[in-house]
């Protein structure tokens, strides 16, 4: 069932290792079939080197397992909240990549300090509010809700990622692989911003006109970066 989607999700999860975004069994990627309302996601605690297509778990949007003999990722409720609220996305990625997690642990949004950031994220990468003790009871679902709440006035396609307070980054995209690409870029710009903050000449936030130029030359109806079709 949904073999093509499972293969895409497997490939995206293995890409986490190639991009040095995960260690051990940390991290997960999912994808969704919007027509069937079924999500394919990495199983919980399975080493990447042992992960096979048959291991990818299928769940519905309420978290019920549709297919698979393994438990789905413990982060599944977070993924489901994002799919239910961000209708334009078809892939979600979660890592504990080093520099992005540093920003999450100090509970600070990543400011847009230059054009490398602006090429992918239209403005700062926000950090969610801290969860209350009551919210810990449904921890992973509460994480998803906290991201959705933070994006009430933010287009999730313009800022395809967030930092979860005290925890780490989640990213998303039009495909599972795109969510991983956004995770890799987030980690890179998190490192740049980290060292800018450490430097004596602290970076200033990017001029709004330069932000507009770099983001919209790659995204939107008037984009002109790259080729008109894939090569």
Each model region followed by its residue ranges:
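Glycine-rich flexible loops
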Residues: 1-231
């Amino acid at each position: 069932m949904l073999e093509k989607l499972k293969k895409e999700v497997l490939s995206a999860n293995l890409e986490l290792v190639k991009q040095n975004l995960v260690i051990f069994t940390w991290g997960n990627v999912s994808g969704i079939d919007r027509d069937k309302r079924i999500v394919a996601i990495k199983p919980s605690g399975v080493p990447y080197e042992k992960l096979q297509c048959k291991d990818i778990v299928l769940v519905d949007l309420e978290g019920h397992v549709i297919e698979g003999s393994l438990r789905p990722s413990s982060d599944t409720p977070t993924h489901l909240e994002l799919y239910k609220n961000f209708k334009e996305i078809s892939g979600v990625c979660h890592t504990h990549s080093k520099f992005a997690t540093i920003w999450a642990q100090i509970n600070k949004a990543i400011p847009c300090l230059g054009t490398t950031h602006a090429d992918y994220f239209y403005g700062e990468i926000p950090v969610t509010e801290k969860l209350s003790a009551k919210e810990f009871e449904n921890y992973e679902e509460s994480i998803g809700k906290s991201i959705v709440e933070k994006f009430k006035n933010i287009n999730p396609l313009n800022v395809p990622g967030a930092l979860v307070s005290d925890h780490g980054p989640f990213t998303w995209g039009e495909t599972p692989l795109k969510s991983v690409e956004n995770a890799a870029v987030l980690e890179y710009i998190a490192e740049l911003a980290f060292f800018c903050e450490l430097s004596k000449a602290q970076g200033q936030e990017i001029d709004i006109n330069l932000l507009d130029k770099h983001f919209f030359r790659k995204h939107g109806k008037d984009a002109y970066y790259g080729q008109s079709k894939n090569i």
